[in-house]
A protein has these predicted regions:
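Acidic, metal-coordinating catalytic segment for phosphate/diphosphate chemistry
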Residues: 35-79
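N-terminal leader/capping segments at the start of a protein or of a new domain
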Residues: 1-47
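Unchanged
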Residues: 103-193
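Conserved beta-strand and immediately adjacent loop positions that scaffold enzyme active sites
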Residues: 79, 87, 174
Length: 206
């Protein structure tokens, strides 16, 4: 199952897995009637005032891939779930509990970007990656352009959880480690793309 999130709603493709998508498509693949139809639907879904999820079944990965490329500019990012003493690191940005993440720079792989962004946003050092987690996908409007952000998540450890330094120039006001008792609150108040994608992983690790 593949999901794209926009604000607190989701577009769900139950018969497609993320690994089936190929977002490196040629211009000729963008011109079919099916691709045009899904592209138009995506544009309508982004602007219509809906609160419920929408499910689209029976679509091929090839058509969806081409429609996504036609509709969005890709903005890949990477981030981390940092563990220490049975807790995980969360940040507060714009008053919303979140996880540290940021854009992948040119020439970086996702793992390197995740380590860099987590250290920059939290001040945590001594970071090591344990394993990769599921990828979240959400879209947003930036300077009149719709963007689709796949965020590649990694489970991490830190050897020094006692020293944090929130990146205030990125509007991060707090870095804190949350326990299993805080998890329900976090999942209820964070972005749905994080709660749906990483919720079970966080429950397992805490």
């Amino acid at each position: 199952m593949y999901k794209i999130f926009y604000e607190q709603r989701a577009l769900i493709f139950p018969n497609i897995e993320e690994k089936e998508l190929d977002l490196d498509v040629t211009s000729t693949q963008l011109e079919s009637y099916e691709v045009e139809k899904i592209h138009n639907f995506l544009r309508q879904w982004l602007v219509v005032n809906l609160t419920e999820d929408v499910t689209i079944d029976g679509l091929s990965p090839e058509v969806l891939s081409a429609a996504l490329v036609r509709t969005f500019r890709l903005a890949p990012a990477a981030g981390g779930v940092v563990l220490a003493d049975g807790q995980f690191a969360a940040i507060e940005r714009h008053g919303i509990p979140d996880l540290p993440k940021g854009h992948i720079e040119e020439g970086e792989d996702a793992a390197t970007a995740a380590l860099r962004e987590v250290e920059e946003e939290t001040g945590l050092t001594g970071l090591t990656i344990i394993r990769q987690l599921p990828t979240s996908w959400h879209c947003y409007l930036y300077e009149d352009e719709w963007r689709l952000k796949p965020t590649y998540w990694f489970l991490m450890n830190t050897s020094d959880p006692d020293h944090t330094n929130p990146q205030t120039d990125e509007d991060i006001t707090e870095v804190t480690f949350l326990s299993e008792y805080d998890l329900e609150w976090f999942l209820k108040n964070t972005y749905r793309s994080i709660a749906d994608t990483l919720g079970e992983e966080l429950k397992t690790e805490n």
